[in-house]
Amino acid sequence: MIETLDKAPFAFTPERLARAQEIITHYPEGRQKSALLPLLHLAQEQAGWMPTEAMDYVAGLLNIQPIEVYEVATFYTMFHVEPVGRHVIEICRTGPCCLLGYEGIRDHLCQRLGVDVGGTSADGMFTVKEVECLAACGMGPVMQIREKYHMHLT
């Protein structure tokens, strides 16, 4: 476990803990690690992002090493390992969206919100992130806000 100073320990609310325990039961004995992604989603729903304390907590629930959780949480762009705004705007930056002009959309959003890519607006409402493929290549440029796709952006 990574020790941090002045940070409150993370624990699921009773409702989320019950949900986590129910999710874990879907996997056979010895294969509970397979519940990692859904538990990370639960943790991020509760915290608003993925603090180290939440990753350590999930590792404890699954009886796995914290590094195993860190590897997964840092691999997927859907998990925010730094604090983010209330609304995260994720803009696809891969080939098809790039060819269709995502840069102009990204630059316009950043200018309007007064942030750089990866930054959060002064009021804490918006974070703009570039992400890898959102799997909507035929509808680019694409961005996602709160798990809702916005396609054919101009």
What does each model-found stretch correspond to?
Residues 1-154:
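Signature of N-terminal electron-transfer/Fe-S-associated modules in redox systems
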